[in-house]
Amino acid sequence: MAKLLEITGKAISGEWGQDDDTGTGIPVLRTTNFTNEGFVNYKNVVTRSISKKNIAEKYLRHGDVIIEKSGGSDKQPVGRVIFFEGEENKYLFNNFTGLLRVQNPEEWLPKYVFYALYAYYRNGGTRAFENRTTGLHNLQVDNYVKSVDIPKLSCRKQQHICETLDHVRAAVAYREQQLTKLDELVKARFVEMFGDPISNTKRWDVIELGSLTGIGSSKRIFEKEYVSEGIPFYRTKEIVELSKGNPISTELYITEKRFLEIKEQYGVPQKGDLLISAVGTIGVIWIVDEKNDFYFKDGNLIRVDSSDRFNSTYMKTLLESLIAEYKKQMSSGTAYSALTISGLMKMKIYDVPLSLQNQFADFVAKVDKSKLFVGSAAAHKPFDIGFFSQKHCATPCKRGIISSKHMIFH
């Protein structure tokens, strides 16, 4: 084992400088340019006027690892890392990030060190080094560098791990491209059958959504009514997870007794209803299934009742486009963005034959089957260390990636 400090030395601090008024400044990478897959996103790279001397060593080189020092959230811890493979001696990095540069590449392959640190991050290791001030999450970089252990393997074994992970990462990226294309296929099929959802190119009659079905929220549940187990209580977070087909991490519950009271007096979501996020991440839609009883938070979510006058899959696809347009118009006129019940009720819906809606839903069901097949591979991220270490890792890490508090591979 070797401490990260022995491999890279202390993290090098970034630069920010002044506004670039002349357009001749230095490109500076920020946490905005971090991706959760460990790549650098070169969109929206800012240029800054930096006049400090002795910054030559701070220009990024191939194989540098950039670490996030400040940022993150309760859901996403600080400490992400990205691997730099771009043009050398062109980019700097800002003061919310740090540079970890392998001092002896002949002994430690930079990409191996990167993969090890990424594995550590994905397994929550950086949470132990977080400070929180005014909502920001800051990484105790010095303690991090002093504490993290990385196994000392031969260069041949390091290379094998890197090559294997590179192949897995490339395969996952390809699968994710396929998923994106399948989503685009659904949108293209919708336009082919019904025309543009905003401009109504096929001249359908339109009616207000509120005239088709009931639209509302939920009975208010007070904080004192939350319990540690019982009937799941969904907020925007859970609906976003469900809409993506991901397992949910329910944190709030109400008692079954309270649920049954609400069910009898006011009703609860039924199969085919649409739940739509109304604040924060606006416009995420989930079609309710019958897998589990649940209730949901008023204000956060809007419920569109299912109806024999429309197909829920068709309506979900149409509303996604209409709400996206609604958000554009809303963002230019208000400081606080939210989807309202009244706004949803007034949305103009195509009055198309139900038979056509059902045809579209059948097409979507076939695409969803393809997405399940493709997604089963894409879901296994190359940095999903439990998956990698148990099924694909070579002998050096076959016993698991993290085996002690600050160990990466084992």
Protein language model regions, located:
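ATP/adenylate-binding site constellation spanning eukaryotic-like Ser/Thr protein kinases
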Residues: T31, V141, K187, V206, ...
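Non-catalytic DNA-recognition/assembly elements of restriction-modification systems
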Residues: M1-E15, D149-E163, A171-K219, S228, ...
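A short glycine-rich beta-alpha junction/loop motif
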Residues: A2, W16, K90-G98, T126-R156, ...
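A short beta-sheet element
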Residues: R30, A56-Y118, R235, F259-L260, ...
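Low-complexity, Lys/Gly-biased intrinsically disordered segments
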Residues: M1-E37, K52-A56, K69-D74, K202-G245, ...
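Short, basic/aromatic beta-hairpin or loop at an interaction surface
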Residues: N33-V46, K90-Y91, E241-T255
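Periplasmic-binding protein-like
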Residues: R122-G125, Y326-K327
